[in-house]
Amino acid sequence: MASLLLGTPSMACHSVSFSFSHSQSVAGVSLSSPPTLSLSSSVSTSPALPLIYCGRGDRKTAKGKRFNHSFGNARPKNKNKGRGPPKAPIFPKGDPSQKED
């Protein structure tokens, strides 16, 4: 408590203020733009990672597919889904070392 009275900062304080702006209309008809929200913060923050990630590390872009050697297969497939009925194996007829004349 004594540190608060003396004015020495004991811990970092973050202050955030919100302000809302909305004009009222006459007879239920709105004459202005939609409500706006403004946010001001006294704390400086480092820029966050972008929400849209593109480039070599993005497997959903052409450059990212080439970089990761995925050859266009960005999303894993369920091997049991959409394959149709199983096919019977095909065996070669006869012995390949014998030739028919």
From Swiss-Prot:
Residues 1-54 form a transit peptide. It is found in: Plastid, Chloroplast. GO terms for cellular component: chloroplast; plastid; ribonucleoprotein complex; ribosome. Keywords: Chloroplast, Plastid, Ribonucleoprotein, Ribosomal protein, RNA-binding, rRNA-binding, Transit peptide. Residues 27-47, 59-101 are annotated as: Disordered. One of its GO terms (molecular function) is rRNA binding. The keyword Cytoplasm does not apply. It comes from Spinacia oleracea (Spinach). GO terms for biological process: plastid translation. Its main location: plastid. PANTHER family: 30S RIBOSOMAL PROTEIN S31, CHLOROPLASTIC, SMALL RIBOSOMAL SUBUNIT PROTEIN BTHXC. Disulfide bonds: none annotated. This is Small ribosomal subunit protein bTHXc. Belongs to the bacterial ribosomal protein bTHX family. It holds the Pfam family RPS31. Component of the chloroplast ribosome (chloro-ribosome), a dedicated translation machinery responsible for the synthesis of chloroplast genome-encoded proteins, including proteins of the transcription and translation machinery and components of the photosynthetic apparatus. Component of the chloroplast small ribosomal subunit (SSU). Mature 70S chloroplast ribosomes of higher plants consist of a small (30S) and a large (50S) subunit. The 30S small subunit contains 1 molecule of ribosomal RNA (16S rRNA) and 24 different proteins. The 50S large subunit contains 3 rRNA molecules (23S, 5S and 4.5S rRNA) and 33 different proteins.
